[in-house]
Amino acid sequence: METKKKVVLAFSGGLDTSFCVKYLSEEKGYDVYTAIANTGGFSKPELEKIEKRAMELGATAHATLDIEQEYYEKSIRYMVFGNILRNGTYPISVSSERIFQAIAIIEYAKQIGADAVAHGSTGAGNDQVRFDLTFQILAPEIEIITPTRDMTLTREYEIDYLRKHGITADYKKMEYSINKGLWGTSIGGKETLHSEQTPPEEAYPSQITAEGEERLKLTFEQGELAAVNGTPYTDKVEAIRAVEAIGAKYGIGRDMHIGDTIIGIKGRVGFEAAAPMLIIAAHKMLEKHTLTKWQTYWKDQVATWYGMFLHEAQYLEPVMRDIEAMLLSSQRNVTGTVELILRPRNYTLVGVDSTFDLMKTDFGEYGEVNKAWTADDVKGFTKILGNQIKIFYNVQKRNKK
């Protein structure tokens, strides 16, 4: 009897990967080993439900790979250090976690001696590149299988296929592709395919339940979130969850991201990311008080590149480690507490309390009184500061420009 080929499928329990389990096991005759790399977006009951679904669909075995701490240490904290928002909007939630999921999946595939590795990405998005590139770099000898992409399947086709094979599910809910993670949740569906539409309220996993106002205090130590409303957290993942629980009930962090995909087309996705938006906003305000002008300028430059490389599947590029070293160094004085006021769908930054606050000095108060220089000092400084510009305009005048 011929031994079946062993394939590891990156499994989320969603429509595409559910189709892949059934298709690869029944149509292609593979032994399908499903694996979910949890970056912190799923609770224990949710993970148990995903495992049950995988086995019902025909998986030979299922593995849950817990990588939330690794994801924080190797990605999230650097995204906070860099205040990274793609196009000034999106905290690259899915973009960042996909690489770590791909790394975990391919390492598991090597561990069990798999012949192939599979994922459910379509041919029109970024994830196909993130998975494929990571697999190719870390295990070039293992075959990559992508049924959804290779067969150019629609969500409607996959739903119909599963129904015909007797698979029951909430197919109405499956009309939306929801990627839930520690650093935000993305929502894709028929509305995100059209520039003039947006997903309906019910498409979002979190619903707005809070009214009025609430004050929130976030404390940072060397750039990392250390306390929420005075409660200290040594586990940074739990600190993020605490902020998410507070902010999500106000609907904070909901938006539409429109960006350029790795493959060169425009893409739209809805998202909700209360914790990332609040943490980044507070962290950025604290940096304004504790970093010098040139620290801020150069950190912003490299952070933009870091976010772009992370989005475009370049996490394993060696320069990323160099950028991380600079981002880490920049945070040595980013310590203090930031207060915010939360309201339904928005928030206000109130102020900062930090012993490293560069406004709290004996040199002067902006727009008020100077204590470290005289009026004549300023007159002389201004005269020298304008020298080159004065020379330029003098030359222009002589040349009648």
Residue ranges and their predicted role:
Residues 2-401:
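Nucleotide-activated chemistry modules centered on ATP-dependent adenylation/adenylyltransferase
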